[in-house]
């Protein structure tokens, strides 16, 4: 009796990277926008008046909510076919939920922002505003769940396959939002210590979640540890995470004891934003270099064109421009109304 030897091999065609830097920008800005909307909704439904902080959070939310979809459309393949999500709904997939939540979130948020500015400029309020705030918050929750789960359900990438992924993405975006609120607040603001404590507790929760994720006896945790052991670049990114986390936490701790100068507040927000962005870059782009079938890593070099550095700088430039344009337009209207 003879036994034939069967050799099975997996052959894969070379292919371009699936997600481009545009996707990192989308996940970065939409996370901050969702956290800002949730915080603003909390302030709106409180009994205490916090109109200044609510308007500040709404400004952050609306500018990020405008920037994020533009980055997403640049990353999508065959953008003109986005209407297929609505013509042929597939509710068992996570991406169509994004096509539902994203326009609803942006629309409700824009109406809420306009209602707040009308109240601030003309002292005219609407009962529907609180429901716009609630609708924006619900859509924000949907966006946070969808953006986390559309990645963490991918079993083909074991590093992504974890419930810790969406939690870590949410907490990293929340601490970045708190940093933006800190840098925009007045030094004598009575609510500044509460925001500082909010960021400290968020950073502590983020550190705990990431530590449990990496050290856990799960498929994802094991894959992360193996990646750090084998790939030198993974070690560098891990060191970057820890360094930025420590720097941000240190700046927050110092701010509780002594008021930070404007320079240190800028360094705080840059450190927090860098931590939020680097986590997304590492998990969304660098994880794609981990091989599925072969025994070697797939090196990725960031190009300088519209799919590389230009995309990153352009979206940040757009966001800053929106902040300046909207803020100065509102300030100009305020001065004109005050002086007739």
Swiss-Prot record:
Topology versus the membrane: Multi-pass membrane protein
Family matches, as PANTHER family: PROTEIN NRFD
Highest classification ranks of the organism: Bacteria, Pseudomonadati, Pseudomonadota, Gammaproteobacteria, Enterobacterales
Oligomeric and partner information: Probably composed of three subunits: TtrA, TtrB and TtrC.
Compartment(s) where it occurs, according to its Swiss-Prot or TrEMBL record: Cell inner membrane
UniProt entry keywords in alphabetical sequence: Cell inner membrane, Cell membrane, Membrane, Transmembrane, Transmembrane helix
Gene that specifies this protein: ttrC
Transmembrane segments: 19-39, 57-77, 94-114, 128-148, 164-184, 195-215, 236-256, 266-286, 306-326
Entry's family note: Belongs to the NrfD family.
One Pfam family recorded for the sequence: NrfD
Signals that turn on the gene: Transcriptionally regulated by Fnr and by the TtrR/TtrS two-component regulatory system.
A cellular component term, taken from the record's GO annotations: plasma membrane
Protein name: Tetrathionate reductase subunit C
Domain of life where this protein originates: Bacteria
Biological role: Part of a membrane-bound tetrathionate reductase that catalyzes the reduction of tetrathionate to thiosulfate. TtrC probably anchors TtrA and TtrB to the periplasmic face of the cytoplasmic membrane. May transfer electrons from membrane quinol to TtrB. During mice infection, the ability to use tetrathionate as an electron acceptor is a growth advantage for S.typhimurium over the competing microbiota in the lumen of the inflamed gut.
């Amino acid at each position: 009796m003879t036994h034939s030897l069967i050799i099975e091999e997996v052959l894969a065609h070379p292919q371009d990277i699936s997600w481009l830097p545009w996707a990192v920008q989308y996940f970065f800005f939409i996370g901050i926008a969702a956290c800002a909307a949730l915080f603003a909704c909390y302030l709106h439904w409180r009994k205490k008046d916090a109109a200044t902080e609510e308007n500040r959070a709404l400004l952050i939310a609306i500018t990020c909510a405008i920037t994020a979809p533009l980055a997403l459309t640049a990353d999508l393949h065959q953008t003109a076919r986005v209407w297929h999500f609505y013509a042929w709904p597939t509710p068992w997939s996570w991406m169509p939920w994004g096509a539902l939540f994203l326009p609803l979130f942006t629309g409700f948020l824009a109406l809420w922002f306009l209602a707040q500015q009308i109240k601030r400029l003309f002292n005219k309020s609407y009962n529907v505003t609180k429901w716009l705030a609630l609708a924006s918050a619900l859509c924000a929750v949907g966006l946070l769940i969808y953006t986390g789960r559309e990645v963490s359900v991918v079993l083909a990438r074991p590093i992504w396959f974890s419930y810790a992924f969406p939690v870590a993405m949410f907490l990293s975006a929340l601490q970045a939002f708190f940093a933006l609120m800190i840098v925009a607040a007045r030094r004598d603001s009575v609510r500044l210590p509460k925001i500082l404590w909010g960021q400290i507790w968020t950073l502590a929760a983020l550190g705990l979640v990431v530590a449990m994720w990496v050290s856990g006896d799960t498929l994802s945790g094991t894959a992360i540890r193996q990646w750090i052991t084998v790939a030198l670049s993974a070690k560098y990114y891990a060191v970057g995470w820890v360094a930025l986390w420590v720097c941000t936490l240190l700046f927050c701790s110092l701010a509780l004891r002594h008021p930070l100068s404007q320079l240190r507040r800028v360094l705080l927000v840059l450190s927090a934003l860098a931590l939020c962005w680097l986590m997304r870059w590492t998990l969304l782009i660098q994880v794609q270099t981990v091989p599925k079938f072969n025994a070697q890593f797939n090196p990725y070099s960031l190009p300088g064109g519209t799919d590389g550095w230009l995309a990153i700088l352009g979206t940040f430039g757009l966001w800053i421009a929106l902040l300046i344009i909207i803020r100065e337009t509102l300030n100009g209207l305020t001065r004109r109304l005050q002086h007739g």
